[in-house]
Amino acid sequence: MFARDIGIDLGTANVLIHVKGKGIVLNEPSVVALDKNSGKVLAVGEEARRMVGRTPGNIVAIRPLKDGVIADFEVTEAMLKHFINKLNVKGLFSKPRMLICCPTNITSVEQKAIKEAAEKSGGKHVYLEEEPKVAAIGAGMEIFQPSGNMVVDIGGGTTDIAVISMGDIVTSSSIKMAGDKFDMEILNYIKREYKLLIGERTAEDIKIKVATVFPDARHEEISIRGRDMVSGLPRTITVNSKEVEEALRESVAVIVQAAKQVLERTPPELSADIIDRGVIITGGGALLNGLDQLLAEELKVPVLVAENPMDCVAIGTGVMLDNMDKLPKRKLS
């Protein structure tokens, strides 16, 4: 039995794994629950996420990746090992080749950390590839043609924006403004306006169910419970789409600005292609209501949300694994 090639979208919020010949076989939160006293791993992924904010003092649920890079090496390694063992992709005599995606502007030290964690978790050859490039492939863009393609990949920790032509990134930007920051903005808004403390999971719920970032694009409301900062007792309030739009306005403006700067640095010939083809948004942030409308209005180009935006990077790794022999031999070490 030979080992299978696997592609990993090692995200700040979720880990997706694509196994060659099988498709996406794993999609779990990047969360690990540890016993603080012994350092023992108690749960990984979905099971650990359910513990967030609900555990006794000696159990901590941590996210080992922050802003798209490894914040806790040992825990990342334990998490990857757990997921890979779960899949049973190792051969009797061989280890799998791995293709892992990372943000565009990470340092060589950060690249090395990702590579080492993957090797220790059972990878034979580990290849690193830039996330927006893989997301563009997963979204079905023809990036190996001599024409301009622009992708905005909004994950949990980072937003990666890139213009790609002939299979390479021409201009790009990676900013630490993405899904997690949106949740924090909502959480802080509720705290400020209502003197109510809510958890990150509630903030994420609000984002998914009622949020919009384009004025008047959505009119919905949600009842949420939290702890009153004055009385210390539980209290229920209703939050609407207009309030969430206000809470997210500044954060989204940062992404719009970064996208504008990438477009401004793009050679004119490629800009003309982008005006024709449009910009594609991928990642979980692409599901934020009204974001495509806002970007289209600000960038003055068509903007499309990819099909299955959250899976684009993992799908892209699958395409790249199938064409591994044709790809430029660029093993990042």
From Swiss-Prot:
B.subtilis has three MreB paralogs: MreB, Mbl and MreBH. All paralogs have the ability to support rod-shaped cell growth normal conditions. The multiplicity of paralogs becomes important under stress conditions. They are probably used to allow cells to maintain proper growth and morphogenesis under changing conditions. Disulfide bonds: none annotated. InterPro entries: ATPase_NBD (IPR043129), MreB (IPR004753), MreB_MamK-like (IPR056546). One of its GO terms (biological process) is regulation of cell shape. Its main location: cytoplasm. The keyword Manganese does not apply. Forms polymers. Forms a complex with MreB and MreBH. Interacts with MreC. GO terms for cellular component: cytoplasm. ATP binds at residues 12-14, 156-158, 204-207, 284-287. This is Cell shape-determining protein Mbl. HAMAP family: MreB. The keyword tRNA-binding does not apply. Forms membrane-associated dynamic filaments that are essential for cell shape determination. Acts by regulating cell wall synthesis and cell elongation, and thus cell shape. A feedback loop between cell geometry and Mbl localization may maintain elongated cell shape by targeting cell wall growth to regions of negative cell wall curvature. Filaments rotate around the cell circumference in concert with the cell wall synthesis enzymes. The process is driven by the cell wall synthesis machinery and does not depend on Mbl polymerization. Organizes peptidoglycan synthesis in the lateral cell wall. The gene is mbl. It is found in: Cytoplasm. Belongs to the FtsA/MreB family. GO terms for molecular function: ATP binding. Pfam families: MreB_Mbl. Disruption phenotype: Mutants are bent and twisted at irregular angles. Depletion leads to a strong defect in chromosome segregation. Keywords: ATP-binding, Cell shape, Cytoplasm, Nucleotide-binding.
